[in-house]
From Swiss-Prot:
This protein's name: Uncharacterized protein MG459
Organism lineage string: Bacteria, Bacillati, Mycoplasmatota, Mycoplasmoidales, Mycoplasmoidaceae
One of the record's GO molecular function terms: 2-C-methyl-D-erythritol 2,4-cyclodiphosphate synthase activity
InterPro entries: MECDP_synthase, MECDP_synthase_sf
Cystine residue pairs: none
A GO biological process held by the record: terpenoid biosynthetic process
Pfam families linked to this entry: YgbB (PF02542)
Length: 169
C-alpha cells in the first residue's frame, strides 16, 4: 500500500461586493448574498480558493505537478473555456479525471480563513456535497475549518489530502 500526502494553498485579495451580478465561489458553491467578491486584478478569472487549494494538494500528492500547467499543457496562465460561471464548478471534476485511475482519496482537511462578516456555516453542507460529487467521495472524507484571517482583505485556504495508490490488476 502506498500512501501519499499533498498540500495545497491559495490566497486571494477580496473586496466589498457592489453589484449583485458579481459571483463569489467557495467550494463550488455560488455565495449569492456574499458581502465580498474576489479582486480579479490579483486573482484568476476562475477563482475558488477551496477548489484550487484542494486541486493543488491532489496534484502534489499524486506527483502530477502543477495543476495550472497540466490543465493548460505548459501554458503559464490559466485559460479556461467559457465563462467563470461555467468553469468554476469544473475545477475539481477536471482534477479528478487526472487521478481517478491510479489513486483513492482517503482524506481531505481544509482550513479556510475568511472575514467573519461572511457566514460560511450555512453553506457547509452544499460545499461538502459539491466536493463529494466532483471527487466521488463520502462526506466523512472531508473536514472544513473556518477561521478569521489576519488581513480582512484576504481569503486564504490550505488543503491537505491523503491519497492511496490503487492496486492495478
Amino acid at each position: 500500500m502506498q500512501l501519499r500526502v499533498g498540500l495545497g494553498s491559495k490566497k486571494y485579495h477580496i473586496k466589498l461586493r457592489k453589484e449583485s451580478k458579481n459571483k463569489f465561489w467557495l467550494g463550488g458553491v455560488d455565495f449569492e448574498n456574499s458581502k465580498y467578491i474576489y479582486d480579479l486584478e490579483n486573482s484568476d478569472e476562475v477563482s475558488d480558493v477551496i477548489q484550487l487549494a484542494v486541486a493543488d494538494a491532489l496534484f502534489g500528492a499524486t506527483a502530477l505537478g502543477d495543476g495550472h500547467i497540466v490543465f493548460n499543457k505548459g501554458k503559464s496562465t490559466v485559460q479556461f473555456k467559457g465563462t467563470a460561471k461555467k468553469e468554476a464548478p469544473r475545477v475539481l471534476a477536471r482534477t479528478y479525471n487526472f487521478i481517478r485511475k491510479n489513486w483513492i482519496i482517503n482524506n481531505i482537511d481544509i482550513s479556510l480563513e475568511i472575514p467573519q462578516e461572511q457566514k460560511v456555516d450555512d453553506y457547509k453542507h452544499a460545499i461538502f456535497a459539491f466536493i463529494c460529487s466532483a471527487l466521488r467521495i463520502s462526506e466523512l472524507t472531508i473536514n472544513l475549518k473556518v477561521r478569521k484571517p489576519l488581513d480582512s482583505n484576504e481569503i486564504n485556504c490550505l488543503a491537505v489530502v491523503l491519497v492511496e495508490r490503487q492496486k492495478t490488476k
